[in-house]
C-alpha cells in the first residue's frame, strides 16, 4: 500500500497528567511537605532556623544546631476531600517520620552531631475521576491513525496481530500495549461496522483498512476505527516513597553550621484504572462500550547526597542564612502491568476481551535541587522563616538497562543508555519549579507554641505538554495507558501547636494542599498537520481531538509527633 511516511504526525491542541513514561516518572521526582509536626506546622520554612530533625532531608546543616540528643516519631491521617466514592477509603492512617540525633561537644562552642531519619517523602494515595464528551474522537482511532501513518505495521503471527518486527530485537516501538489490544480485540473485525471498512472487514494486511476499497483524500485506502461520543475514567493510586537519611553535621563557634546527608529511597507505587468509551458504528448508532482496565506497579530504590550550610552574617544578631544543594536522586526501577480490554459491544462488533502484560527495568534520574533560606528569632518568643527552592525537572533523565559486563577482576557493572526520544519528551513536557515556603512560630508561654505556614509550588508541566504515544521509545512500547493530566500550581496552608514538659514534647499539625489540573484521555491528532497543510489531501474524518476536563486534588493531613530530648 502506498503510504505517506510521517515521522511526527500528531499535534496537541490542548493542555494536559498521569510506568516509565514522562508523566508517570514525574510523580517520583517531586516531594511532599512532610516530617515532624513542628516542621509541617511552619510550612517547612526551617532551612535557616534548623534544630528540627526534618531539616536532615532539606538543609542538612539544620542538624548542626542541636545541643542535646533527641528522638522523635510522627504519625497521622490523610484524606482526599474531592475524591469520588468508588469503594476505596478516602482517609488512611500514615506513619510519616522517625528520627534520632546524637550530639557530641567538640570544643567550647562547637559540636559534631550525627543523625538518622525516615520520612515518607511522597504519598501516592489519590483517586482521580473524569467524564467528558468525545464528539467522534476515540482512543482506538488514535491506535488506527498510528498504523495508518506507518508508525507501526501489522502482521499476523501465532493467530494474533503484532507489529511487523515485534518478535525480534527491533520492534516498532510506537506500538504500545493499548495498540495491541485494539488491533486484536476491536479493529480487525472480519464482518465489521468500523468507519472506513466495507462488509468484508480486515483482510490480514499491514494496515487495518486494507479491505475497505474506499480511498481517502490522500489516495490511500481509508483507516478503520470506531468513533465514540463520550468516556468515563477513574484511577486509584496508592503507595509511597520512603526516604532514609544518614547525617553528619556540626557548628563552629555557634556562628557557622554545616551538614552532609546521604539519602536512600524506597519506591512503592501502584495504580488501578478503568477507561471506558461509548462507541458508535459507521452509521453513528450506539453499539455499546469498551473498557481498558490497567493495573501497574513501579518499585525500586534510589540514592542522593545533600549538603548545606547555615551562618550568622552579623555576630550579635540572631539573623541566619541557609544554603543547600541536593544531587539528583538516582533511581533503579522496575515496572510491571497487566492490562485488559473488556468489550460490551453489540453482536457482530469486535472480537471479545483481550489481555496483555509487561515488565520493564529502567533508570530514572531526578534533577539537581538548590535552595536558600532566611531565619530570624525575637528572643525566645518568635521565630520567622522563609525558604526558596528551585529544581528544573526538564533535566530529568531516563535510561534503558542493557544488561552488564564483568571487568578483569570479576566485578559486575550494569550498563544503560539514555532513552533519547523520551528525554526529548521530558524537555518538552516538564519545566523548572520554584517552591516558596514561609512560616512562623510564636510562644505565648515558654512551654507552648503555635505555628503557621504557607507554601507555593509552581507548575511542573508545560501547558502545551502531552503524553506522546508516537515516540520511538521503549517507554512507549511498554506503555499501557494514554491518559495524562497537566497539573497546575500547588498551594499548601499549615497550622500547628506544640507543648513541652521537661524532656518530652508533643506537637500537632494540620496541612491543607490543593492542586488543579486538566485531564485528557489521549493525545489529539490533526490530519491537516499530517499532510503538511495540503487541503487537497486533508481528511477531516481523521481528526481526533479531545477536550480537557478540569480536575483537582485536595488533601488534608493531620500529623502528631512525640519527642524526647536527653
What feature does the model see in each segment?
Residues 20-33, 96, 103-566:
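Outer-membrane beta-barrel porins/channels
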Residues 11-12, 68, 389:
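Hydrophobic alpha-helical membrane-insertion segments
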Residues 1-23, 562, 566:
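Bacterial Sec-dependent N-terminal signal peptides
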Residues 43, 47-54, 248:
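Long, acidic, intrinsically disordered low-complexity segments
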Residues 37, 49-58, 63-135, 239-242:
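Outer-membrane beta-barrel translocator/receptor signature
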Residues 9, 66, 270:
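Active-site-proximal flexible loops/turns
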Residues 30-48:
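N-terminal targeting signals for Sec/Tat export/insertion, comprising classic cleavable signal peptides
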Amino acid at each position: 500500500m502506498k503510504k505517506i511516511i510521517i515521522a511526527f504526525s500528531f499535534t496537541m491542541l490542548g493542555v494536559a497528567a498521569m510506568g516509565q513514561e514522562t508523566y508517570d516518572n514525574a510523580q517520583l521526582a517531586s516531594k511532599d511537605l512532610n516530617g515532624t509536626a513542628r516542621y509541617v506546622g511552619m510550612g517547612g520554612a526551617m532551612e535557616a532556623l534548623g534544630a528540627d530533625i526534618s531539616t536532615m532531608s532539606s538543609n542538612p546543616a539544620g542538624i548542626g544546631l542541636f545541643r542535646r540528643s533527641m528522638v522523635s516519631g510522627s504519625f497521622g491521617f490523610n484524606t482526599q476531600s474531592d475524591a469520588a466514592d468508588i469503594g476505596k477509603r478516602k482517609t488512611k492512617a500514615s506513619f510519616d517520620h522517625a528520627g534520632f540525633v546524637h550530639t557530641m561537644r567538640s570544643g567550647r562552642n562547637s559540636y559534631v552531631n550525627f543523625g538518622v531519619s525516615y520520612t515518607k517523602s511522597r504519598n501516592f494515595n489519590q483517586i482521580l475521576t473524569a467524564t467528558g464528551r468525545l464528539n467522534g474522537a476515540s482512543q482506538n482511532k488514535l491506535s488506527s491513525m498510528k498504523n495508518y501513518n506507518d508508525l507501526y505495521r501489522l502482521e499476523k503471527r501465532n493467530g494474533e496481530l503484532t507489529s511487523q518486527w515485534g518478535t525480534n530485537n527491533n520492534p516498532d516501538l510506537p506500538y504500545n500495549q493499548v495498540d495491541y489490544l485494539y488491533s486484536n480485540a476491536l479493529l480487525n473485525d472480519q464482518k465489521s461496522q468500523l468507519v472506513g471498512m466495507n462488509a468484508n472487514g480486515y483482510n490480514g494486511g499491514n494496515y487495518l483498512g486494507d479491505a475497505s476499497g474506499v480511498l481517502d483524500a490522500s489516495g490511500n485506502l481509508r483507516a478503520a476505527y470506531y468513533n465514540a461520543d463520550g468516556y468515563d475514567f477513574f484511577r486509584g493510586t496508592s503507595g509511597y516513597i520512603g526516604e532514609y537519611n544518614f547525617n553528619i553535621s556540626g557548628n563552629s563557634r555557634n556562628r557557622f553550621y554545616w551538614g552532609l546527608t546521604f539519602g536512600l529511597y524506597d519506591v512503592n507505587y501502584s495504580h488501578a484504572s478503568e477507561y471506558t468509551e461509548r462507541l458508535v458504528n459507521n452509521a453513528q448508532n450506539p453499539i455499546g462500550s469498551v473498557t481498558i482496565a490497567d493495573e501497574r506497579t513501579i518499585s525500586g530504590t534510589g540514592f542522593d547526597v545533600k549538603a548545606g550550610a547555615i551562618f550568622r552574617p552579623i555576630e550579635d544578631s540572631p539573623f541566619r542564612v541557609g544554603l543547600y544543594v541536593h544531587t539528583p536522586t538516582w533511581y533503579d526501577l522496575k515496572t510491571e502491568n497487566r492490562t485488559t480490554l473488556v468489550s460490551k459491544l453489540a453482536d457482530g462488533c469486535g472480537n471479545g476481551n483481550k489481555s496483555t502484560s509487561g515488565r520493564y527495568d529502567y533508570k530514572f534520574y531526578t534533577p539537581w535541587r538548590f535552595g536558600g533560606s532566611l531565619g530570624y528569632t525575637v528572643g525566645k518568643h518568635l521565630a520567622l522563616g522563609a525558604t526558596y527552592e528551585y529544581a528544573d525537572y526538564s533535566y530529568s533523565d531516563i535510561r534503558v538497562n542493557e544488561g552488564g559486563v564483568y571487568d578483569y577482576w570479576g566485578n559486575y557493572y550494569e550498563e544503560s543508555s539514555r532513552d533519547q526520544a523520551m528525554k526529548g519528551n521530558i524537555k518538552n513536557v516538564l519545566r523548572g519549579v520554584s517552591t516558596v515556603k514561609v512560616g512562623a512560630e510564636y510562644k505565648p508561654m515558654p512551654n507552648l507554641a503555635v505555628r503557621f505556614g504557607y507554601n507555593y509550588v509552581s507548575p511542573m508541566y508545560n501547558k502545551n505538554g502531552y503524553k506522546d504515544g508516537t515516540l520511538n521509545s521503549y517507554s512507549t512500547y511498554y506503555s499501557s495507558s494514554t491518559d495524562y493530566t497537566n497539573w497546575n500550581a500547588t498551594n499548601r496552608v499549615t497550622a500547628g501547636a506544640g507543648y513541652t514538659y521537661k524532656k518530652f514534647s508533643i506537637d500537632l499539625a494540620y496541612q491543607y494542599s490543593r492542586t488543579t489540573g486538566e485531564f485528557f484521555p489521549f493525545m489529539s491528532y490533526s490530519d491537516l498537520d499530517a499532510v503538511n497543510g495540503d487541503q487537497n489531501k486533508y481528511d477531516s474524518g481523521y481528526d481526533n481531538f479531545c477536550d480537557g476536563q478540569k480536575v483537582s486534588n485536595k488533601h488534608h493531613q493531620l500529623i502528631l509527633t512525640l519527642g524526647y530530648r536527653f
